[in-house]
């Protein structure tokens, strides 16, 4: 799956339609998706998601995983859902986004991220 949003992102956007190219069973299909198809509000833009450095990126990721930044959580759910779908862990993109949303809202994504941090601190140096 290759995606490109109409607002210039190289990922599925919460602020515009996204063009999708998908290779499945030897056939390439192209189609457009929009946030509303997944029950996600379409934002006027992605300005609130812009970051300037690694620290801001980490802060926004933590906010998304903790559901403290709705826009960040929703763009993570859309793109993680696409990864779940591409990994053949669900029937379609809608189910992938639903699963990603469930994992985010349950706190499991936050828990796994915390475990990753702990693991890397144990193995560092």
Language model features: what each stretch is:
Residues 1-125:
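Glycine-rich anion-binding loops and their surrounding alpha/beta cores
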